[in-house]
């Protein structure tokens, strides 16, 4: 998270590995408030752990729905219902504008919809956007990433894509 929007404040954590999870463990106390930025699997898992520890969770996802890049709408619906049933406030189509300092650490967050919420800590679990510029320049079909079939084949002969840049077909 860039420093100009509060990423350097105490109480702001990025979630990439187990060491990151360990670094924020003391924040998970009953009655505290957190903002989770990102509605992918990382953000949703952080929300599940936080609510089990009694933390009040607001989760923002800039996309129109949680898990938009990685799952079918039905999967998003399932996880949304499961998390909201546990008290998670999920706000889709809403991102973070900036974090606000209070007494030397994060104290509130201004969101892209103009609302402001008080928080005790923030978790950044935004993942990455697919790097598909080369495919685009080559005229390869893109659909939420580089479109591939079940074998990883793209629209170009003898060109394959895999990993976060690939968009796999949904076979409901």
Residue ranges and their predicted role:
Residues 38-43, 114, 120, 163:
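Conserved phosphate-binding and hydrolysis motifs of nucleotide-dependent enzymes
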């Amino acid at each position: 998270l860039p420093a100009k929007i509060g990423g350097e404040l105490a109480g702001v954590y990025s979630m990439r590995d187990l060491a990151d999870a360990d670094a924020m463990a003391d924040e998970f106390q009953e009655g505290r408030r957190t903002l989770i930025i990102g509605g992918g699997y990382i953000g949703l898992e952080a929300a599940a752990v936080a609510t089990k520890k009694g933390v009040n969770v607001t989760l923002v996802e800039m996309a129109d729905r949680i898990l938009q890049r990685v799952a079918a709408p039905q999967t998003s619906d399932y996880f949304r219902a499961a998390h909201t049933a546990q008290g998670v406030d999920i706000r889709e189509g809403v991102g973070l504008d900036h974090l606000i300092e209070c007494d030397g650490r994060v104290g509130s967050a201004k969101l892209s919809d103009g609302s402001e919420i008080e928080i005790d800590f923030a978790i950044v679990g935004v993942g990455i956007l697919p790097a598909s510029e080369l495919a685009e320049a080559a005229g390869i079909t893109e659909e939420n990433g580089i479109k591939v079939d079940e074998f990883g084949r793209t629209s170009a002969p003898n060109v394959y894509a895999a990993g976060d840049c690939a968009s796999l077909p949904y076979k409901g």
